[in-house]
Amino acid sequence: MNISSSIDPNDEKKYSLSLEDNKEFVPIKNFWSTALINATFFDINDKDKKILEKLTDICYIPLEYPSFKIEFRFEPNEYMKETTLIKTYHFVEKEKDELRKVEGCEINWVDDEKNPTIKLKTRKKTRGRVRETVTTSKEIDSFFNIFNTKDTDINKELVEAQFFRNDFLENMLEYYLNIMEIHYDDNDEEEEQDDEEKA
């Protein structure tokens, strides 16, 4: 079985990068969740990990170059109503380093307890003779925040887009096996040497 991770952005077809459609391919349990966690690029909390175990495929779908979208496919689960989540990166025409806008998607969580993007806090409150339970929520770091693009930082989104296209999807197997090498450029080495000399 040959797993090819080379992506030609000018090719208009859809890439099912986990080879899910290959009849000879035997799915690897927790392949994508393990690869995403090992990449250490995203803030992934404990609830995220459980939900990502339901992730069966990640598809890279080229749009008008150099724009593209990423499709995350999940098996039916007890956390959210959707089985497909989509993130779209719209670039300035022919400018692969200039992101114009991004589009996420709405996620309908089964209930607040299943929502990994918030932390619930319950406390007892007394009003006269009545004692009631009050539940409040606080937004927290989560992988699934990438689909909320309401108040997004376009520079951070560009880094994310480049990570998916130029790094993660080309090296998914290495990330899964946790053998991905970290490459430093010459500037990084010079800065490291300067720090050592100062020490």
Task: State where each predicted segment sits.
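Mixed-charge, low-complexity intrinsically disordered segments
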Residues: 1-199
